[in-house]
Curated annotation (Swiss-Prot):
This is Elongation factor Ts. The gene is tsf. The keyword Protein biosynthesis applies. Residues 79-82 are annotated as: Involved in Mg(2+) ion dislocation from EF-Tu. Its main location: cytoplasm. Belongs to the EF-Ts family. It comes from Xylella fastidiosa (strain 9a5c).
Amino acid sequence: MEITASLVKELRERTGVGMMECKKALSENAGNIDAAVEWLRKSGLVKADKKAGRIAAEGRIVVVHDGGKAVLVEINSETDFVAKDSHFLAFAEAVAQAALVAGAVDVEALKSVKLPSGETVEEARAAVIAKIGENVRVRRLARIDSANNVAAYVHGGRIGVLVEVKGGDVELARGIAMHVAAMNPPYNKVADVSAEFLEKEKEIELSKMSEKDKSKPADILEKIISGKINKIVKEVTLYGQPYVLNADQSVEQVVKAAGADVIGFQRMEVGEGIEKIVEDYASEVMKQVGLS
């Protein structure tokens, strides 16, 4: 497969590695981007694939919370310009409120829910599109209904979190929600980390070791690898991370000191996993006034 400049550019954006190293990684892996990322990780040139954290689409995250009930909704627009439009914002808030009241559990069920205007969510979406001249999509919905402490947190309309905590108090739950928003842990506790993830990380750590280290006795080698994996597990679990409101303690220590337990959490960030053609602000304005 031909290694094109666009492939090299994409790999560089995902990893932050130099162009020559990216070209070599692609050549070694027949132009396969994902395989090239892993090859670079095994070579010790990059710690992680940055693509997963790149936000591509626009829109808004809306959170609505009432006691033990809370919903988290992502509404997408094509541009940031429209994401700040009053019609778009009113629609997003109305959809989230309706989702909470109706008990909707997914986007498909939400489409037929009626808003205070008498329109269904889908009908209102079509009306908003007609007003603003841009596609609008209700992309994701998450909810919690529980007798436990439930907290909701939204940051700048772009990141939203729901957290369920058994025991403790609402303030603890809110602090945990803020932590999840800031640190984005993939897993809750050690028990939640997948065997596939652990095996892959073990393979990567082994690949990065020197031949001298690899030649050590099996029990010593296992201790070295286990130490590295344990460190990684702390980084990717909520319980293992230093608490953002008190970095001297881990989240697990803070939660246990309160006699509590984090049952689970939901986190959304605008545009996760969606690619977007980059346009400058002037282009967005021109598009809105019909001059492009």
